[in-house]
Amino acid sequence: MNKIISSFILLLIAVSVFGQSKIEYLEYDLKNGMHVILHEDHSAPVVTTAVMYHVGAKDENPERTGFAHFFEHLLFEGTENIPRGEWFTIVTSNGGSNNANTTDDRTYYYEVFPSNSVELGLWMESERLMHPIINQIGVDTQNEVVIEEKGLLVA
């Protein structure tokens, strides 16, 4: 009986793996070196702009950790063209949502907007990359936020 059940489960796994259609995408490098993966999915009228940086906790001094996560937070503080505290306001007032996370080997930011706002998502991520403003008030604010988050994880 166990052989029959095991065989059936194996068959289901095989059917689900081989039955999946190939996800089509374009992949290329821009002149500035940025690697782009572009995928169209018309199942919902939204666009996601996602940027992944190949930097994370692995790049830190093991005796002083937390900087990658701290910088993830710091890059929401504002840019030359997005005033401090306005990042989330711009996203939500345009019907969007966003978030970020950091792992050992990467830092990932994304925005999801209605599909007619692809330019806004691209502009915001280019602002984060090219024109961030890092000042003492942002450092102090995000330091407190990260400390509070760490406390929540420990509790």
Question: Where are the model-predicted features located?
Answer:
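Acidic/histidine-enriched segments that form metal/cofactor-coordinating
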Residues: 53, 79-80, 86-155
